[in-house]
Amino acid sequence: LSIAITAQAQTLKAPKETAMDRFLRYVKIDTQSAEDQAAVPSTKKQFNLANLLVKELGAIGAQNARVSEFGIVYATVPGNLADNSKVPVIGFISHMDTSPAVSGENVNVVIHKNYRGGDIVLPKDPTQVITVEKSPVLKELIGDDIITADGTTLLGSDDKSGIAEIMTMVDTLMQNPQLK
């Protein structure tokens, strides 16, 4: 199976935008929630990202892209099986709100290129340190790029990274109808 996937992957058209590029755009959109609100979503600014996602879904060819009164984004990637066979529908779900505890406004992204190991000090607030002791997974990321905020805001990776992955997957599926 992995050989077939690898061979097929070589013929795939790339998405219009990488997941990382999408993520870097999405984290700059403030979607901070509010604990003291009963409304869903708890802040109107969450619609800013929701409406952008609907626009992008339409541009990449997803059908019936829309946002509900509750800020939930829906879209359909049409089936492409020749025999119109009935197959299970799959939903991909991610939230877009960020923590009310830390600001999500004016996010400044820092990309730590080719991480060399050790603790990561956030540049605008040196008291904010991601330590190897508390985050031992850093040991596995040596040589990779690590994305953080500058220490003055929340990055919003939970779960804008998930949204970026879902949007990139939809883009890839729409550009590659040979995928079944």
Regions found by a protein language model. Give the residues of each.
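Generic structural signal for well-ordered, non-membrane alpha-helical segments
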Residues: 12, 16-19, 42-46, 50, ...
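Generic secondary-structure signature for well-ordered alpha-helical cores
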Residues: 28-32, 55-63, 171-179
